Amino acid sequence: MPEGFSVMNPYEHADVRRVVTTFCERYYGGSRQRLPVWGINPGRYGAGLTGLSFTDPNALRQDLGIESAIVGRREPSAEFIYTMIDAYGGPASYYHDVYMSALSPLGFLRGGVNINFYDDAGFMREIVPFVIDCMRAQTSYGLRTDACVVLGTGKLKQFMERYVQPELQYQKVHYLEHPRYIMQYRRRFIDDYVTSYVTAIRDLVGN
């Protein structure tokens, strides 16, 4: 790790491992090939706490029905994602079709503040093999290999096209605006973004 960086690994906590196990048993059963939806890396108030991408403690209890001692504030990206999931038909329908994760299952802090791995050019280059290995490992669970959705249209798109696509070679990659960007800068258009998410995912799923 570069000087001043630290790793955020939610899976070192027993309650997080229990939550993730409960979630997978409840929502990821069966042998269906799910569409991968990739984010960046865990943030402090979402997956960094719960171990589940774009899921804060509130969504964990209220939307997924999983009780836990994990506490934390409402996280904007989780708020958007679970609004979208509700529009899709609810968690059971959504996770029947979709596997949602991140390019890196570990989060990163610099000076105690959340950072995306691509925000530091040197660190970004060094983390590429780790990201590819993590994506391949998750794909081996039985995910679709022909298509995916990526939540990010700026630096994450550039990272995908430069480093990931040559390795995983998806035939179709659909890029959507990141939930954080929507909630911070385009919140008044949230309904339009929810519709665009649901439409894009349903089109790729074939529903």
Residue ranges with predicted function:
Residues 168-178:
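Short hydrophobic/aromatic-enriched beta-strand-loop microsegments
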Residues 178-189:
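Short, charged, surface-exposed secondary-structure boundary motifs
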Residues 1-147, 154-162, 166, 184, ...:
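A polyanion-binding, active-site-adjacent surface
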Residues 151-154, 176-179:
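Short, loop-centered acidic/histidine patches that primarily coordinate divalent metals
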